[in-house]
Amino acid sequence: MDRYCVFGNPIGHSKSPLIHRLFAEQTGQVLTYEARLAPLDDFIGDARAFFAEGLGANVTVPFKEEAFRLADELSERARRAGAVNTLKKLEGGRLLGDNTDGAGLTRDLQDNAGFALTGKRILVLGAGGAVRGVLEPFLAQKPAVLVIANRTVAKAEQLVREFADLGPLVAAGFDWLDAPVDLIVNGTSASLGGELPPIAPSLIQPGHTLCYDMMYGKEPTAFNRWAFDQGAARCLDGLGMLVEQAAEAFELWRGVRPNTAPVLAELRRQLAG
């Protein structure tokens, strides 16, 4: 049977096996998909062992940069991201590395939330790997401007230098900004600790600005609770991004696009339970 997996460490919390099982059932694809705890000091060895038989894998924290180095070929979006979250075995055993994170977020915003990015003023908080992965897909939608705000401004400036050829990018500190924007994406991990990036409430235009946290949980994240209190039009979490990036990977492997809506609904139901 065709084998797939997700590599991570830790990995017990992963929803990927459930997501891909539901995708496979829905599309009539016959495959297995497992969560695989890779050793912190030998991801590449474990990945090579899996790909002796396996056909594809997702890669999560902390192995995305190592997967980038493992890949024999890279998609343009993976090359830009400097990280790989999806591997596919090609003819002859070569590995293609892709990054579906940014495409997943873009699709969640545009298809599921009905929010077009074209012509919008976008603020992205953070300058780490999660943000790097979304810049190419976001800029492909031709926003009016995309501002990267970070505590260490030099990191944001580095991303601007790397991606400036793709569209209008600006670097800023968290406290440099006060004019309202159309979309704020929290790409920091602050919500994991119940904390907030130190940004001005005036960035949110009540009833207009959409706020999106890449993190998700049973309860609204700290960032989304704050955004709601400031009058944000909508506050979305990263569960839709998780399901949509998985669908991108599934389509890359199997050549068929699953319907994400029932899968996202099932995950929401389980999360609430």
UniProtKB/Swiss-Prot annotation:
The active site is at 64 (proton acceptor). GO terms for molecular function: NADP binding; shikimate 3-dehydrogenase (NADP+) activity. The keyword NADP applies. Disulfide bonds: none annotated. Shikimate binds at residues 14-16, 60, 85, 101, 216. It comes from the Bacteria. NADP(+) binds at residues 76, 126-130, 150-155, 214, 238. SUPFAM superfamilies: Aminoacid dehydrogenase-like, N-terminal domain, NAD(P)-binding Rossmann-fold domains. GO terms for biological process: amino acid biosynthetic process; aromatic amino acid family biosynthetic process; chorismate biosynthetic process; shikimate metabolic process. It catalyses: shikimate + NADP(+) = 3-dehydroshikimate + NADPH + H(+). Pathway: Metabolic intermediate biosynthesis; chorismate biosynthesis; chorismate from D-erythrose 4-phosphate and phosphoenolpyruvate: step 4/7. Its EC number is 1.1.1.25. Keywords: Amino-acid biosynthesis, Aromatic amino acid biosynthesis, NADP, Oxidoreductase. GO terms for cellular component: cytosol. It is an enzyme of class 1 (oxidoreductase). Belongs to the shikimate dehydrogenase family. Involved in the biosynthesis of the chorismate, which leads to the biosynthesis of aromatic amino acids. Catalyzes the reversible NADPH linked reduction of 3-dehydroshikimate (DHSA) to yield shikimate (SA). HAMAP family: Shikimate_DH_AroE. PANTHER family: BIFUNCTIONAL 3-DEHYDROQUINATE DEHYDRATASE_SHIKIMATE DEHYDROGENASE, CHLOROPLASTIC, SHIKIMATE DEHYDROGENASE. Homodimer. This is Shikimate dehydrogenase (NADP(+)). It comes from Ectopseudomonas mendocina (strain ymp). The lineage of its organism: Bacteria, Pseudomonadati, Pseudomonadota, Gammaproteobacteria, Pseudomonadales. The gene is aroE.
